[in-house]
């Protein structure tokens, strides 16, 4: 699995985990956050490796559907990019400290 996919799934899980069942949360948390293998998760829950795989794949698809409709991750990335640009622009201003403090306050609101 690519690092890019893992990072994306971690973000999607972070944004949308409240919409998942407790089993989906557990499987995704163990697989993506705790780096458990499918076999280790299957052993932990006394189910087949295939059952874990199917559950994780369905959950990944659900997370992608949520993102397609709600765009929380996309908007997060856009805000992050805008904050970076604001910081770059503020670094050339005389009121840099005030501008930087304002930007940092905005970032904390996220």
Swiss-Prot record:
It comes from the Bacteria. Pfam families: UPF0122. InterPro entries: RNA_pol_sigma_r3/r4-like, UPF0122, UPF0122_fam_protein, WH-like_DNA-bd_sf. Might take part in the signal recognition particle (SRP) pathway. This is inferred from the conservation of its genetic proximity to ftsY/ffh. May be a regulatory protein. NCBIfam families: PRK00118.1-4, PRK00118.1-6, YlxM. Belongs to the UPF0122 family. This is UPF0122 protein RBAM_015800. It comes from Bacillus velezensis (strain DSM 23117 / BGSC 10A6 / LMG 26770 / FZB42) (Bacillus amyloliquefaciens subsp. plantarum). The lineage of its organism: Bacteria, Bacillati, Bacillota, Bacilli, Bacillales.
């Amino acid at each position: 699995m690519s690092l890019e996919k893992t990072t994306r799934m971690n973000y999607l899980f972070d944004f949308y985990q409240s919409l998942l069942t407790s089993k989906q949360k557990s499987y995704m948390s163990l697989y993506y956050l705790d780096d458990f293998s499918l076999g280790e998760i299957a052993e932990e829950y006394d189910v087949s490796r295939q059952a874990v795989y199917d559950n994780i794949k369905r959950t990944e698809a659900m997370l992608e559907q949520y993102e397609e409709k709600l765009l929380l991750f996309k908007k997060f990335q856009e805000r992050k990019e805008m904050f970076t640009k604001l910081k770059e622009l503020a670094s050339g201003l005389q009121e840099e400290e005030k501008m930087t403090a304002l930007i940092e306050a905005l970032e904390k609101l996220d």
